[in-house]
Amino acid sequence: MEHSRERGRSSNMRHNSREPYENPSRSRSLSRDPNQVDRRQPRSASQIRVPNLFHRKKTDALIVPPAPKDICPTLKKGFLCDSKFCKKDHQLDSLNDHELLLLIARRTCGIIESNSQITSPKDMRLANPTAEDFSQGNSPKLTLAVLLQIAEHWATRDLRQIEDSKLRALLTLCAVLTRKFSKSQLGLLCETHLRHEGLGQDQADSVLEVYQRLHSDKGGNFEAALWQQWDRQSLIMFISAFLNIALQIPCESSSVVVSGLATLYPAQDNSTPSEATNDTTWSSTVE
């Protein structure tokens, strides 16, 4: 009897001694001791929040549309073009795989000798020209009249042998003259460009995008990107086409502007037959 009572007492003592460790959360008080120091682990460097103000802005390179290509039909047929009067594009990158393989096959057989000229690379310093590259010297003031004289002069020149600094300056001239056009006339400028170069409508989007981005270009960033990413031959073709058409198409389409400026046209002058005919046609359209 006493032995069973002692055994029951010892089991109760073991149970009571084990009870505080069953649930440790019970022993924690809800009220925090004010004298207790809160020792938290310091945040790692990856957890520290940095204000967005100090994040450096990412500046990606400008995406330039592909240059319009008018591939030489002789080259597309697999023959090397040896004509000195052909003004089409002769870049082999413009050919598809079939046309390129056909050209290689004919070339390796020795049927046609190559007379193609390899264009020299552009001076990439001129993508962002400095004052030394375009020193003004004693040049006249750049008025609208001077811009037109420069455009008329270079519209009739062959640009294939021109030096890089002048070609870069002509690209700037095209950008400046493009901004003299009304934004509504950029579509007409694109259509005239396609007709002048004999390009298909599949090239219209690229040409129109170039004119639109030159028109809204701030700081010459897109102009510099064109110089960097287009090859020399594409730049020459684009500049030549622009200089030939820019002085021939209207720069304004607003009927109010056109009718208002038409009244300011000088009176008929019979000094030369060409001027007289031009005045006659103008006056007839105005009336």
Swiss-Prot record:
Gene name as annotated: VP30
Name of protein: Transcriptional activator VP30
Maturation and modification: Phosphorylated by host. Phosphorylation negatively regulates the transcription activation. Phosphorylation and dephosphorylation take place in viral inclusion bodies and are largely influenced by the presence of NP. Dephosphorylated by host PPP2R5C; this dephosphorylation enhances viral transcription and is mediated by NP.
Region entry Interaction with the nucleoprotein, spans: 180-197
Assembly and interaction partners: Homohexamer; hexamerization is essential for RNA binding. Interacts with the nucleoprotein/NP; this interaction plays both essential and inhibitory roles in viral RNA synthesis. Interacts with VP35. Interacts with host STAU1. Interacts (via C-terminus) with host RBBP6 isoform 1. Interacts with host DICER1; this interaction prevents TARBP2/TRBP binding to DICER1 and thus allows the virus to counteract host RNA silencing.
Biological process per Gene Ontology, one example term: symbiont-mediated suppression of host innate immune response
Upper taxonomic lineage: Viruses, Riboviria, Orthornavirae, Negarnaviricota, Haploviricotina
Alphabetically ordered keywords of this record: Activator, Host cytoplasm, Host-virus interaction, Inhibition of host innate immune response by virus, Metal-binding, Phosphoprotein, RNA-binding, Suppressor of RNA silencing, Transcription, Viral immunoevasion, Viral nucleoprotein, Virion, Zinc, Zinc-finger
Reported effect, residue 67 to T: In strain: Isolate Pennsylvania-89
CC per GO annotation: host cell cytoplasm; viral nucleocapsid
Zinc finger (C3H1-type): 72-90
Region RNA-binding, annotated ranges: 26-40
Annotated localization: Virion; Host cytoplasm
Top-rank taxon, per record: Viruses
Keyword Zinc applies: yes
Pfam families with a match to the protein in the record: Transcript_VP30
Molecular function per GO: RNA binding; zinc ion binding
Residue span of region Disordered: 1-52, 268-287
Family membership noted in the UniProt record: Belongs to the filoviridae transcriptional activator VP30 family.
